[in-house]
From Swiss-Prot:
Protein's name in the database: Adenylosuccinate synthetase
Pathway: Purine metabolism; AMP biosynthesis via de novo pathway; AMP from IMP: step 1/2
Role of this protein: Plays an important role in the de novo pathway of purine nucleotide biosynthesis. Catalyzes the first committed step in the biosynthesis of AMP from IMP.
Originating species: Geotalea daltonii (strain DSM 22248 / JCM 15807 / FRC-32) (Geobacter daltonii)
Classification via CDD domains: AdSS (cd03108)
Matching Pfam families: Adenylsucc_synt
SMART domains: Adenylsucc_synt
Family statement drawn from the similarity comment of this UniProt entry: Belongs to the adenylosuccinate synthetase family.
InterPro entries: Adenylosuccin_syn_GTP-bd, Adenylosuccin_syn_Lys_AS, Adenylosuccinate_synth_dom1, Adenylosuccinate_synth_dom2, Adenylosuccinate_synth_dom3, Adenylosuccinate_synthetase, P-loop_NTPase
Cellular component terms (Gene Ontology): cytoplasm
Binding site for substrate: 300-306
Record key words, sorted: Cytoplasm, GTP-binding, Ligase, Magnesium, Metal-binding, Nucleotide-binding, Purine biosynthesis
GO BP annotations listed: 'de novo' AMP biosynthetic process; IMP metabolic process
């Protein structure tokens, strides 16, 4: 038996969707453990591109149980729209394989309005939020005033909690943010209708997980965003509002740390970031634009162009450390195929000092300059490679150098967006 956690090892958008899609073949359950619809997983199935924001990627595989855990914040409208779209495409028909934790928190309309209004007032201090209400929903969760799915399903409880919440939220919207307040009726009627649809999928998912673990089933835990966006371990305050690291797989589902066997970090062969915050290897030149266009680096959720830069070994070393990575899945190696020279950041220069580890102090991090090592590019198409030996020697040398710098084995190399454009060096489910 092997249970595997998949985490982003950079700032998100590393290609987790494709890797999870591949690993799902070997799992019985696929479990989403944090975040909300601020994340977008892009999958290419045949010639069709499918983008999922909430539902685990495993939904595209027949016979796999998909669970959205208690660590997720759920926008009911988005969830229902995803189900409807998947059913219309013939990708999902069995409601019994999709479960929602009764304990997860619900994103309300006022969360979204507050999110957008705050960002608009932030000026130069913008975080780069997606405006989906994720942060305000987690605020209510931590403040012990959130509305959970089990509350939404009980009209009496929902009525009481919504009235209490609106009293506070409308004051905030009107008096502090200058925004229009909400009426009780408009939210209650809309969300009561959502509840009727959601009821089909609700379960005590922690109990289900432990029953499946006891039965010897294999679990795949699917994270969203990336390590450097973790609320505790990321580049705070330029982070998301949940625990994106491997530890979140336990707190966000009810699984025990003893149940986790392998932790795979997903990393691009270069680096991207969306929104504000430090990014030492960012390229604001022709090379950066080339990475963006060749890699299709535009957000699956927002459509925003991603900031692009060279591979940063310090970021990956940090991800290995705080997640306890047992392997790295390297994605988008093919995007580098047209570069004559490829750079790797092996350290930072700060005030005349050489830094070999990621600084925790944001003021220092923002002033760090990358120290590069240059490697020759392979300048040939690698999308047909299906084994490591199929890669050009210079591409193999590049991968081995990244592995050496990370201090963690690379267990998968992706050379294109399709499922079959993958070189699996080691299967974590067979470890």
């Amino acid at each position: 038996m092997a249970n595997v956690v998949v985490v982003g090892a950079q700032w998100g958008d590393e290609g987790k969707g494709k890797v999870v899609d591949i690993y799902t073949e070997f799992a019985d359950d696929v479990v989403r453990y944090q975040g909300g619809n601020n994340a977008g997983h892009t999958l290419v199935v045949g010639d069709e591109k499918i983008v999922l924001h909430l539902i685990p990627s495993g939904i595209l595989h027949k016979g796999k149980r998909c669970i959205i855990g208690n660590g997720v914040v759920l926008d009911p409208e988005v969830f229902i729209r995803e189900i409807t779209n998947l059913k219309a495409k013939g990708k999902f028909q069995d409601d019994g394989v999709l479960l929602l934790s009764e304990s997860l928190h619900i994103i309300m309309p006022y969360h979204k309005r507050i999110d957008i209004a705050r960002e608009a007032k932030s000026g130069a201090k913008k975080i780069g939020t997606t405006g989906r209400g994720i942060g305000p929903a987690y605020e209510d969760k931590i403040g012990r005033r959130g509305i959970r799915l089990m509350d939404l399903l009980d009209k009496q409880v929902f009525t009481r909690k919504l009235k209490e919440s609106l009293e506070e939220k409308n004051f905030l919207l009107e008096k502090m943010l200058g925004e229009k307040p909400f009426s009780f009726e408009e939210i209650f009627d809309e969300y009561s209708a959502f509840a009727d649809t959601l009821r089909t999928y609700v379960a005590d998912t922690t109990l289900v997980l432990h029953q499946d673990l006891k039965a010897g089933k294999k679990l795949l835990f699917e994270g969203a965003q990336g390590t450097l966006l973790d609320v505790d371990h990321g580049t705070y305050p330029y982070v998301t509002s949940s625990s994106t690291c491997a530890g979140g797989a336990c707190t966000g589902t009810g699984a025990s740390p003893r149940d986790i066997n392998e932790i795979i970090g997903i990393s691009k062969a270069y680096v991207t970031r969306v929104g504000s915050g430090p990014f030492p290897t960012e390229l604001e030149d022709a090379d950066g634009e080339k990475l963006r266009q060749t890699g299709g680096e535009f957000g699956a959720t927002t459509g925003r162009p991603r900031r692009c830069g060279w591979f940063d070994a310090l970021v990956i070393k940090y991800a290995v450390r705080v997640n306890g990575l047992t392997g790295i899945a390297l994605t988008k190696l093919d995007v580098l195929s047209d570069f004559e020279t490829i750079k790797i950041c092996t350290g930072y220069s700060y005030n005349g000092k050489f830094l070999s580890e990621l600084p925790a102090n944001l003021d220092i991090f923002e002033k760090c300059q990358p120290v590069y090592e240059e490697m020759p590019g392979w300048q040939t198409d690698i999308t047909a490679a299906r084994s490591f030996d199929d890669l050009p020697e210079k591409a193999r040398t590049y991968v081995k150098r990244l592995e050496e710098l990370a201090g963690c084995p690379i267990v998968l190399v992706s050379v294109g967006p399709r499922r079959d454009q993958t070189i699996m060096l080691k299967n974590p489910f067979e470890a």
